Curated annotation (Swiss-Prot):
Coiled-coil regions listed in the entry: none
Superkingdom, natural source: Eukaryota
Spans of repeat ANK: 172-201, 205-234, 238-267, 271-300, 304-333
Compositionally biased tracts (Basic and acidic residues): 377-392, 406-421
Protein name per UniProt: Putative POTE ankyrin domain family member M
Length: 508
């Protein structure tokens, strides 16, 4: 099974990679990304762990390690970039046959020797690569086997629950609820929930049964767990909540249910990604649109200060960029390196995105200029007109106030002059009249003096004052008041003439 130094095993020699991996567990453990071919593995910050017993085996299979696993440096001669996309065409056949082995041995590897990284080469989606549990029958007891395979009659399962602890954990800290939820055995999940098992127990990845159900897209089990009160906001060791996994899987119905049961739409994982940022980074346009409708924060930043727009530009998704621009998002925001979305688009040569950003910026400039220019001019015109109108009203009011008294004064003067002319006759009524006329005025049928119109002359000032106070100070009312004054004066003259005639008749 082991190839000689400098040679590579044939593809036919690797018939059962899982069996080989189980036999060579130590080699698989140390030849992964931490291996440098020197017998030392850099795990954590505490120091190097030496496994000198594996030096010979690793040196003999150095090339195989180097070509099958691009991240592993096996013999120390392979220096690949940070993206981990080094490819050796001679090993394509071997890697294709050992794709499952690569996928399960390396969380970041999908069997093609490539890892999905972010714009800066720092992001990997290893948390999303192995949704289902890897279960070995010998590691499970009866209850866990029944929960995983779900082929046990209900009666037997009830007996198992009576005899054993339903919250018991296996070596990977998984309970029966974890296994049943991850594998979609809704009958077992329902029975465990009816028995009031613990809901928020964490496995070795700090995931709850709800997180595993959502991650494995077992919606029926996930809804049952939500209805019984499972917390949807418990993060796993990667910082992802159940909503992150629903967004990654583009499961809008599950995301809607999680939000309905109180999931935090702004929770961040260890990379500082909210569900919206994760959806943009993974180019999940439908769930991005869904989260925007649910009022997700468009100004959220990851740990490098990148916005959703910058991530969309870096990922080269013109459709998501266009969708974000429709929300009037800020295109001038910078990340921690001081770069904007447009600068990323130019450096990445995304011409379509550059054009979208340029058009959006021009529209914003035109909009701002139109809003700032026209309203100010209108305000200036209206303010000037208002000031002129106020000045005109202030100037016209004193003139009207001064003109009305003059009219009244002129009328009063005319009345006084007429009264002076006829004052002797009017005031001499008691002296010139004979005694009989004065005594028998009402009995002899003499023409009595007309008293019906004298009150009008006496009430003239009152009517003039009332008219003055009720006047609305316009030209038409001025003319009416003048006509009334002249009419009243004529009436007064006629009254005095009639009185003179009456006095003359009485004298004769």
């Amino acid at each position: 099974m082991v190839a000689e130094a400098g040679s590579m095993p044939a593809a036919s020699s690797v018939k059962k990679p899982f069996g080989l991996r189980s036999k060579m567990g130590k080699w698989c453990r140390h030849c992964f990304p931490w291996c440098r071919g020197s017998g030392k593995s850099n795990v954590g910050t505490s120091g190097d762990h030496d496994d000198s017993a594996m030096k010979t085996l690793r040196s003999k299979m150095g090339k195989w390690c180097r070509h099958c696993f691009p991240w592993c440096r096996g013999s120390g001669k392979s220096n690949v970039g940070t993206s981990g996309d080094h490819d050796d065409s001679a090993m394509k056949t071997l890697r294709s046959k050992m794709g499952k082995w690569c996928c399960h041995c390396f969380p970041c590897c999908r069997g093609s020797g490539k890892s999905k990284v972010g714009p800066w080469g720092d992001y990997d989606d290893s948390a999303f690569m192995e949704p289902r549990y890897h279960v070995r029958r010998e590691d499970l007891d009866k209850l866990h086997r029944a929960a995983w395979w779900g082929k046990v009659p209900r009666k037997d399962l009830i007996v198992m629950l009576k005899d054993t602890d339903m919250n018991k954990k296996d070596k990977q800290k998984r309970t029966a609820l974890h296994l049943a939820s991850a594998n979609g055995n809704s009958e077992v999940v329902k029975l465990l929930l009816d028995r009031r098992c613990q809901l928020n127990i964490l496995d070795n990845k700090k995931r709850t049964a709800l997180t595993k159900a959502v991650q494995c897209q077992e919606d029926e089990c996930a809804l049952m767990l939500l209805e019984h009160g499972t917390d949807p906001n418990i993060p796993d060791e990667y910082g992802n909540t159940a909503l992150h996994y629903a967004i990654y899987n583009e499961d809008k119905l599950m995301a809607k249910a999680l939000l309905l049961y109180g999931a935090d739409i702004e929770s961040k994982n260890k990379h500082g990604l909210t569900p919206l940022l994760l959806g943009v980074h993974e180019q999940k346009q439908q769930v991005v649109k869904f989260l925007i409708k649910k009022k997700a924060n468009l100004n959220a930043l990851d740990r490098y200060g990148r916005t959703v727009l910058i991530l969309a530009v870096c990922c080269g998704s013109a459709s998501i960029v266009s969708l974000l621009l429709e929300q009037n998002i800020d295109v001038s925001s910078q990340d921690l390196s001081g770069q904007t979305a447009r600068e990323y688009a130019v450096s990445s040569r995304h011409n379509v995105i550059c054009q979208l950003l340029s058009d959006y910026k021009e529209k914003q400039i035109l909009k701002v200029s139109s809003e700032n220019s026209n309203p100010e001019q209108d305000l200036k015109l209206t303010s000037e007109e208002e000031s002129q109108r106020l000045k005109g009203s202030e100037n016209s009011q004193p003139e009207e106030m001064s003109q009305e008294p003059e009219i009244n004064k002129g009328g009063d003067r005319k009345v006084e002059e007429e009264m002076k002319k006829h004052g002797s006759t009017h005031m001499g009524f008691p002296e010139n009249l004979p005694n009989g006329a004065t005594a028998d005025n009402g009995d002899d049928g003499l023409i009595p003096p007309r008293k019906s119109r004298t009150p009008e002359s006496q009430q003239f000032p009152d009517t003039e004052n009332e008219q003055y106070h009720s006047d609305e100070q316009n030209d038409t009312q001025k003319q009416l008041s003048e006509e009334q004054n002249t009419g009243i004066l004529q009436d007064e003259i006629l009254i005095h003439e009639e009185k003179q005639i009456e006095v003359a008749e009485n004298e004769f």
